[in-house]
Each structure stands twice: as structure tokens, then as C-alpha cells.
Amino acid sequence: MTALDHPQPRPGIKNIAAYVPGRESAPGVEKIWKLSSNETPLGPSPAALEAVREASQHLEIYPDGSASKLRDAIAKAHGLNPANILCSNGSDELLALLAQTYLMPGDEGIYTEHGFLVYRIQILAAGATPVVAREKDERADVDAILAAVTERTKIVFLANPNNPTGTYLPMEEVKRLRSGLPRKVLLVLDAAYAEYVRRNDYEAGVELVSSNDNVVMTRTFSKIHGLAGLRIGWMYAPIHVVDAVNRVRGPFNVNAIAIEAGTAATHDKAHVERAVEHNETWRTWLAQELEKLGLRVTPSVANFLLIHFPENGSKTAEEADAFLTARGYILRRVTGYGFPHALRLTVGTEEANRGVIAALAEFLER
């Protein structure tokens, strides 16, 4: 059979590098600590788990196509108008829908040098051209983003905080970015890790969306809420953006269990605070211990750390990854993000955190 004997994808699709999730297993290793996907070590809210059990008794019924119960809960929690909220099958779906809605061949979409790989994928999937803005000190550079804007630019994706670096832009810098963009350019603020940030100069994007017609904020229940397996995301956006995206999103894109679990998780603020406290304590401890081992760590405000290894010799990131994996500690290689000499470590349970530091110390002392 030749290539012409079966249907072919449109030009450009096969040039897209598929997203590769963090690993979750290691051959021959019985006990695994998965520290590769920035999942919360505290798991979901007990209230969310109870909501899952109750909702699972009625799976023959289609979910509410507008996810109004979840939208109302989110709106109440954040002081927003539910009409400006759109829920989704994970925030990744929103990134795809926004690209599909606002990009076409000939357009350009901008993302930063070490930004989330899904941005590039969705820009290409829409037939548009991805444009990379250089970062400075492993942080988004507003001047570089603005310099990359052309008459063909239609969308700018900014992860704030960023994955995999854990760095962030203060709100004044994000405001400066918005002010410098043409009104026709949509600024997408991906705030997947917003709940973890405890900095006075940070704001996830609510203020900018509320006061502008070309800013969108996306959020997720996959991180601090511990509902990654249910795929729940949401967007706060101007009414005209919500209306446009609603025209292309699939019907019933948020399932019934996700709606109930997300609603319950939104109400359980105590669980979120416990997760924040755990993360603050152990992220600080991990960073200090890693630096004691002589490793450079990018300062992070999220629930993960980017660890830098020597570029040469026997203590490389690749060898560290193999050593740790053989002992059950699975971290994330970030070569695709422009960091071939680094590993990303999720803040885990106390057992996982202490264990991975001990294993790294053993690796470095060999």
C-alpha cells in the first residue's frame, strides 16, 4: 500500500510533534513515585470524591451541556459573572478551541521560548505559524513578546506561572504586555498553577479580563484540586469570546461526573489551603536540599522545580533520570522545552520528597 492508497491529513499535520505526557511507570520497578506531571500529592477533596460516587449512579443521563452548576460555583467563588465563564474538558481543550476560533492559515501565534508545548501544537493544528519570543533569565520577556508582534499576529499564549520553569510575570508586567498589543490580538493567560502563587505582585488575570475586550484567562482543576483524571478546565473571557468559542466546542464537552466533582471541589476551600501549605513547605525544603547538593534550581512559585545538571561529565540530567527511574522516582525530561540538561521535579508527599533527595545525593556521590 502506498501513501496515496488511503486518506491523507491536510498539509502540515504530520509536521506537528505530538505531545508526550510524563511517564508513570518504569520496567522492573515495583514501587513508583510519579513526580513527572505536577499532580497534587494530597489527591482530590473528599467532597469531590463523594460527589463522584453520587453522580456515578446516573450515567445514563446526558450532562448539562452548558455546565451551569459548575459555572455558577466558579463564579461565586471568584466573584465573577457566570455568563463570562465557559467550562471544558480540561484547559487543554480551551487552548485548542481558542486557536481553532481565532487562527487561520497566514496568521501567527506567539508563545515564549520555554512555554507550554501545547501552544505550538494548537497554533500549527489551526494552520497558523508559531512564533517564539525569547525569554530572559528563564522568564517571559514582555519586550521580546511585543517585538515579535506583526500585522499577522492574532493570538499570544502566556503561561503565568510558566511550566516547566515555575517563573511568573508580575501583574504590572502583564498589564504592560496587554497595553502594548494591538486590540485585534487575543492575549491568553494560562493560569493553571495560579492557586499555588503566594506573591503580592501576582494576579491570575481576572482584573485584566474584566477591563479589556482582548484578554482571556484559562484555569484548570487538574493541579491543586487533584482532578486531573476527570479533565476539567474553565475560561473567564469577554462575552464575545465565550459566544465565539461556544459555536465550535463540542456538545456535552464536560461530563456529568466532572461537573459534580468540580462543583464540590470549588466549595472545599480548606482542601485547597492544605494543598498550598504543603506545597509552600516542601517546595522550599526541596529547593534548599537541591542547592546543598550543588544543583542550580530555577526559583519557582508553582508546585514543581526545574533542576539543572552539568552539561558534561558523568552527572548529566540524562544519567540522573536513569538513576532515579531505576529507584522508582520518575521525573520529567524537559529537552523539548529547551532544557536538555535539566529535570522537572513535582513536589510530592513527604516520603517522595525525602526519598528523591536521598537518591539524588547517592547519584551525585558516586
UniProtKB/Swiss-Prot annotation:
Catalytic activity, reaction form: L-histidinol phosphate + 2-oxoglutarate = 3-(imidazol-4-yl)-2-oxopropyl phosphate + L-glutamate
Any Gene Ontology biological process: L-histidine biosynthetic process
GO MF assignments: histidinol-phosphate transaminase activity; pyridoxal phosphate binding
Cofactor(s) required for function per UniProt: pyridoxal 5'-phosphate
Pathway: Amino-acid biosynthesis; L-histidine biosynthesis; L-histidine from 5-phospho-alpha-D-ribose 1-diphosphate: step 7/9
Top-level taxon: Bacteria
UniProt keyword list: Amino-acid biosynthesis, Aminotransferase, Histidine biosynthesis, Pyridoxal phosphate, Transferase
EC number(s) stated in the UniProt entry for this protein: 2.6.1.9
Modified residues (N6-(pyridoxal phosphate)lysine): 223
Coiled coil: none
Any single Pfam family the record assigns to this protein: Aminotran_1_2
Family: Belongs to the class-II pyridoxal-phosphate-dependent aminotransferase family. Histidinol-phosphate aminotransferase subfamily.
The protein's assembly and partners: Homodimer.
Classification via PANTHER family: HISTIDINOL-PHOSPHATE AMINOTRANSFERASE (PTHR43643:SF3), HISTIDINOL-PHOSPHATE AMINOTRANSFERASE 2 (PTHR43643)
Listed name of the protein: Histidinol-phosphate aminotransferase
Organismal lineage: Bacteria, Pseudomonadati, Pseudomonadota, Alphaproteobacteria, Hyphomicrobiales
Gene: hisC
